[in-house]
């Protein structure tokens, strides 16, 4: 009898020790794209149990473009997601009720790629050409701004729907003339196209709005502020840890996504660090949406793309959940 009591107590102790410290709230987090180096901090924090320790059961869903992520979060299909901020502003004007809570790309990651042998030298040469990318790609939403900023008609190009993984093949086969991609996989285009690679960073062409930010469905945020506060603080800490020591961070990403290669994603991550750093992320807080920049981005979208309905830009973002002591290194 005594032995059974001891065994029962031991089993109960083991069960208690292995139970989560907090009841776990599931969060379905949709990415802007398939997992890559830029998503490493989420996988790192999840692997180390940082989210679970705060009562968050984080489910990371691969995405198919910022536009889709914005739509799903705006509609409440996903409570939280990752999307390009310019597209988020456009969607807000159409009624999508989302709030940005953490900025990842302080600099625009958008880039245009082509073959130099095609004769294209810059944006003005895109007129009459075919640009290929997925239908829900954030670059399509922002294209009118880039075109108008460079003095060409946004409708002067033809958009071709292709899968993300087919961009390079389509470019090489010359079934498209130009494609779009984020700067953090610039090294892949360099490797595949070599000296024939033509490239233009949007941030060097008069267009540098905030890039990817974490957005939350407004109604979900209203009822789950404590959860989002914990999520943001863990995520901010994870990004800072990955900047300081990227190797284990990238390894966590690769461990969770078997098809990825460490060397490729490590290079990807180092380019992400470039995109994360601006005056405000270095001096105010990593992840901040600075008021002046957000106002300028709103005016840019309003002028070049148009908003179905004007709104107060401060309604689409908040910095309240950030730890102001965590900054990008100077």
Mark where each language-model region is:
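Secondary-structure end/capping motifs
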Residues: 223-306
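Bacterial N-terminal signal peptides that target proteins for export
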Residues: 1-8
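Sec/Tat signal peptide C-region and signal peptidase I cleavage site
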Residues: 19-23
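Short, glycine-/small- and polar/acidic-enriched structural segments
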Residues: 24-173, 177-184, 200, 208
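Periplasmic-binding protein-like
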Residues: 104-114, 194-220, 228, 232, ...
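Bacterial N-terminal signal peptides
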Residues: 8-17
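Conserved C-terminal helix/tail region of periplasmic/extracytoplasmic solute-binding proteins
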Residues: 294-330
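N-terminal secretory/targeting leader peptides
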Residues: 85, 195, 201, 255-258
């Amino acid at each position: 009898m005594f032995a059974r009591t001891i065994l029962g107590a031991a089993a109960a102790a083991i069960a208690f020790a292995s139970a989560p410290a907090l009841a776990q709230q599931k969060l379905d987090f949709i990415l802007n794209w398939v997992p890559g180096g830029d998503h490493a901090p989420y996988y790192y924090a999840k692997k180390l149990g940082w989210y679970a320790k705060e009562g968050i059961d984080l489910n990371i869903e691969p995405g198919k473009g910022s536009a889709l992520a914005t739509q799903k979060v705006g509609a409440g299909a996903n409570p939280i997601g990752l999307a390009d901020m310019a597209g988020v502003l456009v969607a807000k004007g159409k009624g999508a009720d989302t709030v940005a809570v953490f900025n990842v790309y302080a600099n625009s990651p958008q880039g245009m790629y082509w073959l130099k042998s095609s004769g294209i030298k810059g944006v003005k040469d895109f007129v009459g050409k075919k640009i290929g990318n997925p239908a829900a790609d954030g670059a399509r939403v922002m294209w009118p701004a880039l075109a108008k900023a460079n003095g060409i008609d946004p409708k002067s190009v033809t958009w071709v729907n292709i899968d993300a993984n087919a961009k390079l093949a389509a470019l090489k086969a010359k079934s498209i003339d130009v494609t779009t991609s984020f700067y953090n996989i610039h090294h892949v285009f360099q490797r595949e196209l070599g000296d024939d690679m033509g490239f233009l960073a949007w941030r060097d062409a008069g267009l540098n709005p905030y890039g990817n930010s974490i957005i939350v469905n407004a109604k979900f945020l209203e009822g789950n502020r404590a959860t989002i506060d914990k999520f943001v603080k863990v995520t901010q800490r994870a990004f800072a840890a990955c900047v300081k020591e990227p190797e284990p961070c990238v390894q966590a990403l690769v461990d969770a996504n078997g098809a990825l290669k460490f060397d490729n994603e490590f290079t990807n991550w180092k380019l992400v660090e470039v995109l994360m750093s601006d005056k405000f992320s270095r001096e105010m807080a990593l992840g901040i949406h600075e008021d002046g920049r957000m106002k300028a981005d709103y005016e840019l979208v309003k002028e070049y793309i148009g908003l179905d309905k004007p709104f107060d830009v401060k309604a689409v973002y908040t910095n309240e959940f950030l730890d102001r002591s965590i900054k990008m290194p100077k």
